[in-house]
Swiss-Prot record:
It catalyses: (R)-pantoate + NADP(+) = 2-dehydropantoate + NADPH + H(+). GO terms for cellular component: cytoplasm. It comes from the Bacteria. The gene is panE. InterPro entries: 6-PGluconate_DH-like_C_sf, 6PGD_dom2, ApbA, Ketopantoate_reductase, KPA_reductase, KPR_N, NAD(P)-bd_dom_sf. SUPFAM superfamilies: 6-phosphogluconate dehydrogenase C-terminal domain-like, NAD(P)-binding Rossmann-fold domains. One of its GO terms (biological process) is pantothenate biosynthetic process. Catalyzes the NADPH-dependent reduction of ketopantoate into pantoic acid. This is 2-dehydropantoate 2-reductase. Its main location: cytoplasm. NADP(+) binds at residues 7-12, 94, 120, 257. The active site is at residue 175. GO terms for molecular function: 2-dehydropantoate 2-reductase activity; NADP binding. It is found in: Cytoplasm.
Length: 296
């Protein structure tokens, strides 16, 4: 397949390299304006990819979108007029709501979501480390996307295991619950994920997930608070030494994805008349931090 990766950060670069190794024609669309970008995965041989090449966009069978949620609209909208209407759009990012916000622009395209537990890190612009093996689920956002289940096989051949999940919203909400519990707390307290096992965090994690569960159920997504809590603590223990993406964003004073994580739950709660005081307070704390940097 002809594949373009929009936003080759750590995860996007990981997939670009594995899809290239699986025999696909892969190009990048990065903020960097140079015509080629070289990436190296761990100790493997470096690979050069075409970058910001309009011809690769016009002939793309698949556009893999791995920018951060708050970057989706600005990064994708200028590219849409150059895409064939049969080009599959596959979104792989933290949080929810970014695709909904631009859904009217996407009605003619097959649209897919993916969620992955692979860990990746870019120490430099060109060096990619695969820091943790995981699994990936792919599923449809719209009816055209529902016809594209073969993409799971394409990705599975590149970096297994990958499964097709026709109920991808369930998986996205479960990951959102994990992010709602871990990201704002680790960002505010500037701690590693593992610190959240401390007893003083138990009440707030419980309250966060109770609110998320209520909103999920109003959205007709099945979920039990206890099961979500078990999932959160599994992730905390499995990633104990890790610094969450929001922790890093706050540390480096970068925009966070709070609007598409905690903010998404708060907005959906408002739509359904469900109070989310704990998530709302965390949302405001992160937004206040972001605003303080812009004034500094």
């Amino acid at each position: 397949m002809n594949i373009v990766v929009l936003g080759p950060g750590a995860v996007g670069s990981l997939w670009a390299l594995h899809l290239h190794s699986a025999g696909h024609q892969v190009a990048l669309w990065s903020r960097q304006a140079q015509p080629t970008i070289t990436l190296q995965l761990d100790e493997e041989a470096p690979i050069s990819f075409r970058n910001q090449n309009l011809d690769t966009l016009i002939h793309a069978d698949l556009l893999l979108i791995t920018v951060k949620a708050w970057q989706v609209e600005a990064a994708l909208q200028p590219l849409l007029p150059h895409l064939n209407r049969e080009t599959i759009l596959l979104f792989m990012h933290n949080g929810m709501g970014a695709v909904e916000a631009i859904s009217e622009s996407l009605t003619h395209f097959p649209v897919l979501f993916a969620t992955t537990t692979h860990g990746a890190l870019k120490a430099t612009l060109n060096q990619v480390s695969h820091t943790g093996f995981g699994q990936t689920q792919v599923g449809p956002f719209n009816a055209l996307g529902a016809r594209c289940d073969f993409i799971a096989d394409v990705f599975n051949h590149a970096l297994a295991p990958v499964t097709w999940n026709p109920e991808i919203q369930q998986a996205l909400w479960r990951k959102l619950a994990v992010n709602c519990a871990i990201n704002p707390l680790t960002a505010i307290h500037q701690c590693a994920n593992g610190a959240l096992v401390a007893p003083e965090f138990t009440p707030i994690i419980t309250a966060i997930l109770d609110e998320v569960t209520a909103v999920m159920q109003a959205e007709a997504i099945s979920g039990e608070a206890e099961a979500l809590r078990d999932g959160v603590y599994q992730v905390i223990q499995a990633t104990a030494a890790n610094l969450s993406s929001m922790h890093q964003d706050v540390f480096h004073r970068r925009p966070t994805e709070i609007d598409f994580i905690t903010g998404y739950v708060v907005r959906k709660g408002e739509q359904h008349g469900i109070a989310t005081p704990v998530n709302s307070a965390l949302y405001q704390q992160i937004k206040t931090l972001e605003q303080s940097w812009s004034k500094a």
